[in-house]
Amino acid sequence: MLLSSTAIYAVGASGMYQWSVALSGYVSTETGKAPTAYLWMPEGCQQVKAVVFAQQNMTEEMIFKMPVFQKRMKELGVGLIWVAPCFTQNWNPTTGCQQTFEEMMVGLAGQSGHKELEHVPVIPLGHSAQATFPWNFAAWNPDRTLCVISFHGDAPRTNLCGYGTANVEWGRVRNIDGIPGLMIEGEYEWWEARVRPALAFQMMYPNSCISFLCDAGSGHFECMPETAEYIAMFIRKSLEQRLQVDGSLKKLTPQDGWLACRYNPDLQPNDGDGAKDDIFTINQRPQAAPYIDYQGDRHDAFWYFDQEMAELTEARYAETRGKLVRPLEKPTYTISADGKRVSVNVPADVHVEVISGPLRKVNNHTFEVYPYESGLDNPKRSFTSWLIAIRDGDSKYKRAVQPIEVKFPNPLKK
């Protein structure tokens, strides 16, 4: 299959990505044409150590465009690949997604001159409806997966896939043993039924290395800078502990890491079953400890690389525990007559950020439309943008967040 580039440098209206290829072996149901894979390489990087691979959905865009995340990826020598529209939600190999991926990597290697892309380790990352595919990608690509990031997402082999239908069956022999995986769930989207499959997975696969972070003070839609930093640290630890001199990946042994107690919410009720969840106070929580020394219930604990990662997780939980919730009213917005600007009405103590879509921030109240990478031929995504209003927390209150869906007139419907 021949993959064609849309440009040589600064492809797409955002100017973020340097190279792109059309995935001409796949036709998107959203646009009726091939998706495009965009590649960002850190400035001055001669050879990347790994790439983060995500597909168009929602918060993946926000994470990739965050200056702090790009800064950390540059420090680590890690590239970014974003595909729009997506070519798979569940990574079911019977659909041809594996071949599409492999041809994409060869095409991007050829376009960019970074031949290492043909075999470089991959970090699959997905949010919400895309949060299941990273686990399944790893199960079918265990020797190439550096680590897994399921953001505001799903447990491996979950029965509650973010895309709303059945998961892909792994069979008896497939697993992700020794591959570090990170599941993140927002505090305000908390649902016990999403967490339980992750705990059960560890019992079923005792050689798995599953980390968990409750994104305290956050909901479903947004990524805060401290969470982007956490993800970057997870990637750094993966590189440090797994990447060998010859480019191969060392399998980790969970017994060499740390264990820390799962998150217990202080917001009730949270899972709709009418039953209160067990709540640990800070003093009652079992102390995080090396795997062999952990004194808590191992069935209620998650794995972490080391003391630094386990204690950072505990610190995130302690930061908001016991604080009050101060709801944030949903902001209103207006679109200019020419359809090129959006004005958002928020109080002075609230800031607004872009999650996804064809908007970029001018100031805290003004956002301008630009023809971003998705183009203007996708009825599902080209005319919708998501913003997030944020009131930062303090010593008394948790952070408050409120998503804003902005819909533009769709000329395709005329």
Model regions and ranges:
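Extracellular interdomain linker/stem segments of modular secreted and single-pass surface proteins
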Residues: K407-K413
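Short, exposed coil/turn segments at beta-strand boundaries within extracellular/luminal domains
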Residues: G393-V401
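Alpha/beta-hydrolase-fold serine-hydrolase catalytic core, especially in secreted/extracellular enzymes
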Residues: S208, A216-D338
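The feature captures the conserved acid-bearing segment of alpha/beta-hydrolase catalytic domains
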Residues: L146-A232
